[in-house]
Amino acid sequence: MAKGKRTFQPNNRRRARVHGFRLRMRNSGRAIVSGRRRKGRRALSA
């Protein structure tokens, strides 16, 4: 029986475009970043 491919295929450009800081600075993403700042997260976004 054939196995499917792995679901995580790393790609830095896609990672930045989907989860990056510039994206978080748009609209409601700001709330996410401010919450992570308040919590003291080392990384705010990808």
From Swiss-Prot:
GO cellular component, one term: ribosome
GO MF term (any one): structural constituent of ribosome
Source taxon at top rank: Bacteria
Ribonucleoprotein as UniProt keyword: yes
Pfam families to which the protein is assigned, alphabetical: Ribosomal_L34 (PF00468)
One GO-annotated biological process of the protein: translation
Entry's transmembrane regions: none
UniProt key word DNA repair: no
Alphabetic keyword roster: Ribonucleoprotein, Ribosomal protein
Family, per entry: Belongs to the bacterial ribosomal protein bL34 family.
HAMAP family linked to this entry: Ribosomal_bL34
Protein name per UniProt: Large ribosomal subunit protein bL34
